UniProtKB/Swiss-Prot annotation:
Pathway: Cofactor biosynthesis; FAD biosynthesis; FAD from FMN: step 1/1. This is FAD synthase. InterPro entries: Archaeal_FAD_synthase, Cyt_trans-like, FAD_synth_RibL, Rossmann-like_a/b/a_fold. It comes from the Archaea. Homodimer. The gene is ribL. Its EC number is 2.7.7.2. It comes from Methanosphaerula palustris (strain ATCC BAA-1556 / DSM 19958 / E1-9c). Gene3D superfamilies: HUPs. The lineage of its organism: Archaea, Methanobacteriati, Methanobacteriota, Stenosarchaea group, Methanomicrobia. HAMAP family: FAD_synth_arch (MF_02115).
Length: 153
């Protein structure tokens, strides 16, 4: 059985996330997805959606066989437990595959590291772009404390 690990924040799920997971699943039999902990996200703004809800959403996706939260202190701990054959990186994840491969070897892990390409030129395949679109199109009507009809959101 070929085990694949995909990782990410998965805040504001969008088709780019689904593409990444579908392409990752094609590389093996069992897809494990490690969802970043809220407190560990330091390379971009903190997630909007809490980690437990992001985990629940990722776990419900068809390509995902197992979803788990990352470790709060050691990102390699779940990888050591899973012992994957392949670790996939999204096209915009800030990991150098060569550096990651060396870090894995230092822990006696021999997973192949594969970067998954982008989903194409889709406007809303980025959580940042989704937030920007909400601000641009709905910002004035989304005031804190204002009674807003959910249909308007």
């Amino acid at each position: 059985m070929r085990r694949i690990v995909a990782t990410g924040t998965f805040d504001l799920l969008h088709p780019g996330h689904l593409f990444y997971l579908q392409e990752s699943k094609k590389l093996g039999d069992e897809l494990y997805v490690i969802v970043a902990r809220d407190r560990n996200v330091k390379h971009k703004p903190r997630p909007i959606i809490p980690e437990e809800q992001r985990l629940q959403m990722v776990a419900a996706l068809k390509p995902v066989d197992h979803a788990l939260l990352g470790d709060t202190t050691d990102m390699f701990r779940p990888i050591e437990a899973i012992r994957p054959d392949v670790i996939t990186l999204g096209f915009n994840q800030n990991f150098d595959p060569a550096v990651l491969t060396e870090a894995l070897k230092a822990r006696s892990l021999s997973a192949e590291v594969v970067r998954i390409g982008g989903y194409g030129d889709r406007v809303l395949c980025s959580s940042r772009r989704i937030v920007q679109r909400v601000i641009e199109t709905r910002g004035p009507s989304l005031r804190v404390g204002q009674n807003t009809d959910p249909e308007d959101l």
